[in-house]
């Protein structure tokens, strides 16, 4: 059989059929089937039947193929596809009965029976292509002749035959029910054709033209032929369905007798027969409950098919490091396949807000801090204001417990509450983030209740000068010199009959506050506390987030940053990746809300990155900044030798001087604070950041961007054998003095001996243990920032805050500060493009400029790499002594390997 043989081609197409390519391959299959001859057509039908036996789950595809090729084979070769299928069906049954009677040890009865029952289901589903006597023959051939005497001795084969009848009639039941509709349809066709015939005869009486008479005669003959054919077909169908109904009634009498005696049939077979009777009595319509379940599952599959690729893609991108989130999602998906949970599933998949407020019955999925901060209520922690008096849908808040600055007066925007419960007109005039519908018309700062802890009796020392409702105002000193005295130390608020409280806000109160809340029945809207905040050591992370969320006062910016850094530095080794993401999300959220303080929040991000690299500024120290700043040259340069006239006491170092380990490293010259660039005038090109593309020598860390030979060459590397001042051992004599040369005087030798008394010998330093290799922190702030930019969680927060311009400015500044590189910058730009967000003209302009700058820088880096590769290919080396590029010298010829070398003309004796 050649490869171009039509049967071979059709068989290969049949083997390739799957769910994805079925619609494409079935057209090719039908077109190739027209090229088959009679024998090949028979072989092809046999191949389809064998495919059904091997792959019963794909029987629906083969049924459609049979319906397509049946008229082709019938017209070309007068081959009935149904007859061939029935022949193969009977052969398969004969093989099965022979195996049962042979009693072979290797024969598996259960698997063979299940395979044949799947074949019966297939034959019932493609009933239209089968001969009309198929079901009648099934009843006559497989109905066991059971009587009262022989009923107790039913064999496995007889039980299998009962299952064959039940399976065949169950799958072909809708066709049997179509008998009534079929007959009515033919009656309608009869009346319709009779009306047409009468109209044609009327038309003959009115019209006397010969041509019309001829046409009408032809029409009448054709219609009468159609009527006769339809009548013959309807009679055959009536006889056919009557025969099926009679055979089914005969089978019903036997099967009902077997059902009445419970001991005769196994439970599974008995319920199968009962299901057949229920379908017959219900006109072969599936019961409503089962039908609804099937329809619901079909709709679930349809929705999952439409959204499956998007879900799988998003899960693979966002659940790489979190396997529990992926498990929870698919577990909730498969649990929701029932009817009751289907609406929850559909809402979870189709509603845009499904990831914000998951239902209480479904498992709680941890949200990203960026998504949590982009919600309507942006607090990552639970809050509850117990001193709210809500009677008759009114809100009253007492502010007696808060100590407020004179410059920060809240009394303009806050109404004092009265203890009278009948006062139903009191109002709340300050805004509670975006969740409150009450607007504040006064131009005063508002309290941000976004990050309030859920611990009621927790007392935390807040940094001085920052208003945060996490604790009472009296616990923290104020910025201004004029401070209001606390009004009352005890608040006795009796809140009774509060039945309509829909929003509950909790603040930490002091131990003197006595609050009684009775009959609070409808407290609905509560937000769970962030797991990152609750698991923080000593709850200092909550304080840090509160300081970040607090308002920045212009004269106190440095104090604001200093307080945050002094809280984070002691927790540097304890902070984990989720807690760092929480801090970063708080910074970026406030960067969106307070665009005028963008530079302060950006500088805070850079300071956190420098802290992990040990490049922290001296202003942020562990003791609150009391350590004086250390100049750079004092760290790197060696101390100069003392003059001869200096005393020995001047050379001594003060004992027990506190040393900050974070101040050992200097501030890198290649990274400059963005605040200095924003607040100061732009300096020269050599002192600028990575802000211009045309500067050839600004990026000495990344290499030159110009095409010329670099004018600046790095210093020569130190060799291991090069002696240095530190590694040269001092020659110590018996008196503890260094041996002086013959030209040195006695005064200089005495002074040098006095100075060396306090110097530790190098032998002691050699005995110290070697420091372990520093393992890089995989969860540093820089890595957390990069990973946060790689997905679209942070981008969605900027989009919901309508601060895409801030997002693009942040990307540009992070690139200038050597924190992100060109590939990540291009990926962030592609996330904006793929999100299909509605951008303003300004945002579109900034996005195009950013993309153009990234592409240009990428091209320059490629050119630089090509030039470096070209230099290495030209065999040029740099001479450190002359500071010039020279050609690499040729390697000397090898020594002669024999007694006579023609290349060297030298005889070796």
From Swiss-Prot:
Return the Polar residues bias intervals: 473-490, 721-738
According to the record, the residues making up region (Disordered) are: 178-232, 415-439, 460-537, 627-689, 704-774
Key word Coiled coil present in the record? yes
Provide the coiled-coil residue spans. Answer: 845-877
Composition bias type Low complexity, residue spans = 216-231, 417-436, 491-525, 739-756
Q: Name the Gene Ontology biological process terms.
A: anatomical structure morphogenesis; cellular response to differentiation-inducing factor 1; chemotaxis; negative regulation of sorocarp stalk cell differentiation; sorocarp development; sporulation resulting in formation of a cellular spore
Q: Which InterPro entries match?
A: ARM-type_fold, MIF4G-like_typ-3
Boundaries of each MIF4G domain copy? 7-283
Q: Which UniProt keywords apply?
A: Coiled coil
Instruction: Tell me the GO molecular function terms.
Output: RNA binding
| Cell membrane among keywords | no
The record's statement on gene disruption is: Null cells are arrested at the tight mound stage but accumulate the bright yellow pigment characteristic of mature sori. Although these mutant strains do not form fruiting bodies, many of the cells encapsulate within the mounds. Sporulation occurs about 6 hours earlier, accompanied by precocious expression of a prespore gene, spiA. However, the spores are defective and lose viability over a period of several hours. Unencapsulated cells also die unless they are dissociated from the mounds and shaken in suspension.
SMART domains annotated for this entry? MIF4G (SM00543)
* Acidic residues: compositionally biased ranges: 204-215
Q: What does this protein do?
A: Plays as essential role in regulating terminal differentiation.
Q: What is this protein called?
A: Yellow mounds protein A
Lineage, top ranks? Eukaryota, Amoebozoa, Evosea, Eumycetozoa, Dictyostelia
Gene encoding this chain? Answer: yelA
């Amino acid at each position: 059989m050649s490869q171009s043989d039509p049967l071979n081609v059709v068989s290969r197409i049949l083997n390739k059929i799957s769910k994805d390519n079925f619609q494409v391959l079935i057209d090719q299959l039908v077109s190739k089937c027209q090229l088959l001859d009679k024998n090949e057509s028979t072989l092809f039908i046999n191949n389809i039947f064998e495919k059904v036996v091997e792959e019963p789950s794909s029987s629906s595809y083969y049924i459609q193929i049979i319906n397509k090729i049946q008229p082709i084979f019938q017209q070309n070769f007068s081959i009935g596809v149904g007859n061939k299928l029935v022949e193969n069906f009977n052969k398969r049954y004969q093989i099965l009965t022979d195996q049962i009677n042979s009693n072979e040890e290797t024969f598996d009865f259960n698997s063979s029976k299940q395979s044949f029952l799947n074949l019966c289901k297939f034959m019932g589903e493609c009933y239209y292509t089968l001969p009309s006597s198929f079901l009648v023959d099934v009843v006559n051939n497989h109905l066991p002749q059971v009587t009262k005497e022989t009923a107790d001795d039913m064999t496995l084969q007889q039980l299998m035959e009962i299952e064959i009848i039940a399976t065949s009639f169950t799958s072909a039941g809708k066709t049997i029910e179509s008998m009534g509709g079929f007959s009515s349809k033919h009656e309608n066709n009869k009346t319709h054709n009779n009306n047409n015939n009468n109209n044609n005869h009327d038309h003959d009486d009115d019209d006397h033209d010969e041509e019309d008479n001829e046409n009408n005669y032809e029409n009448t003959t054709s219609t009468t032929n159609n009527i006769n054919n339809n009548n013959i077909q309807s009679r055959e169908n009536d006889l056919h369905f009557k025969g099926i109904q009679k055979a089914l009634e005969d089978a019903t009498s036997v099967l009902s007798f077997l059902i009445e005696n419970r001991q005769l049939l196994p439970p599974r077979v008995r319920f199968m027969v009962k299901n057949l009777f229920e379908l017959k009595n219900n006109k072969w319509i599936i019961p409503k409950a089962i039908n609804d379940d099937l329809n619901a599952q079909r709709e679930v599959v349809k929705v999952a098919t439409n959204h499956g690729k998007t879900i799988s893609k998003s899960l693979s991108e966002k659940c790489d490091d979190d396997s529990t989130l992926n498990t929870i999602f698919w577990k909730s998906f498969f649990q929701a396949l029932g009817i009751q949970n289907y609406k929850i599933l559909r809402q979870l998949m189709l509603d845009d807000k499904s990831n914000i407020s998951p239902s209480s019955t479904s498992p709680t999925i941890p949200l990203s801090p960026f998504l949590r901060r982009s919600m309507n209520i942006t607090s990552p922690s639970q809050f509850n204001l117990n001193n709210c008096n809500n009677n008759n849908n009114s809100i009253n808040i007492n502010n007696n417990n808060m100590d407020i600055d004179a410059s920060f007066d809240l009394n303009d925007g806050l109404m004092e509450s009265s203890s009278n419960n009948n006062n139903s007109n009191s109002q709340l005039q300050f805004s509670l983030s975006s969740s409150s519908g009450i607007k504040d018309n006064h131009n005063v700062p508002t309290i941000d209740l976004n990050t309030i802890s859920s611990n009621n009796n927790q007392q935390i020392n807040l940094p001085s000068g920052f208003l945060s409702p996490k604790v009472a105002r009296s616990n923290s000193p104020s910025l201004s010199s004029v401070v209001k005295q606390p009004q009352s130390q005890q608040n006795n608020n009796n809140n009774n009959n509060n039945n309509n409280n829909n929003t509950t806000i909790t603040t930490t109160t002091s131990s003197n506050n006595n609050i009684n809340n009775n009959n609070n029945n409808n407290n609905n809207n509560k937000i769970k506390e962030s797991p990152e905040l609750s698991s923080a050591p000593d709850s200092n992370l909550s304080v840090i987030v509160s300081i970040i969320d607090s308002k920045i006062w212009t004269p106190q910016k440095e104090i604001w940053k200093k307080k945050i850094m002094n809280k984070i530095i002691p927790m540097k080794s304890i902070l984990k990746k989720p807690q760092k993401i929480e801090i970063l999300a708080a910074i970026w959220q406030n960067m969106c809300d307070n665009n005028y303080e963008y530079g302060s929040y950006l500088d805070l991000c850079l300071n956190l990155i420098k802290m992990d690299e040990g490049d922290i500024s001296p202003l942020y120290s562990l003791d609150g900044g009391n350590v004086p700043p250390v100049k750079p040259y004092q760290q790197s340069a060696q101390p100069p030798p003392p003059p001869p006239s200096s005393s020995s006491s001047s050379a001594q170092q003060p004992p027990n001087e506190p040393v900050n380990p974070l101040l050992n490293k200097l501030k890198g010259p290649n990274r400059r604070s963005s605040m200095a660039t924003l607040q100061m005038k732009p300096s020269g090109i050599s002192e600028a950041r990575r802000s211009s593309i045309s500067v050839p020598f600004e990026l000495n860390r990344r290499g030159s961007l110009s095409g010329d030979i670099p004018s600046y060459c790095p210093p020569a590397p130190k060799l291991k054998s090069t002696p240095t001042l530190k590694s040269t051992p001092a020659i110590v004599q018996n008196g503890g003095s260094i041996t002086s040369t013959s030209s040195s005087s006695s005064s200089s030798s005495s002074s040098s001996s006095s100075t060396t008394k306090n110097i530790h010998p190098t032998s002691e330093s050699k005995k110290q243990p070697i420091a372990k290799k520093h393992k890089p922190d995989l969860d540093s702030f820089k890595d957390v920032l990069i990973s946060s930019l790689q997905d679209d969680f942070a981008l969605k927060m900027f989009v919901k805050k309508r601060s895409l311009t801030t997002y693009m400015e942040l990307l540009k500044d992070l690139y200038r500060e050597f924190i992100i590189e060109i590939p990540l910058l291009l990926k962030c730009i592609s996330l904006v493009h793929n999100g299909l967000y509605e951008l303003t003209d300004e945002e579109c302009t900034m996005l195009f400029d950013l993309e153009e700058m990234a592409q240009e820088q990428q091209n320059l880096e490629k050119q630089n790499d090509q030039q470096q590769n070209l230099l290495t290919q030209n065999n040029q080396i740099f001479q450190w002594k002359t500071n010039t590029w020279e050609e690499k010298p040729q390697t000397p010829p090898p020594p002669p390997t024999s007694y006579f070398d023609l290349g060297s003309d030298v005889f070796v004796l």
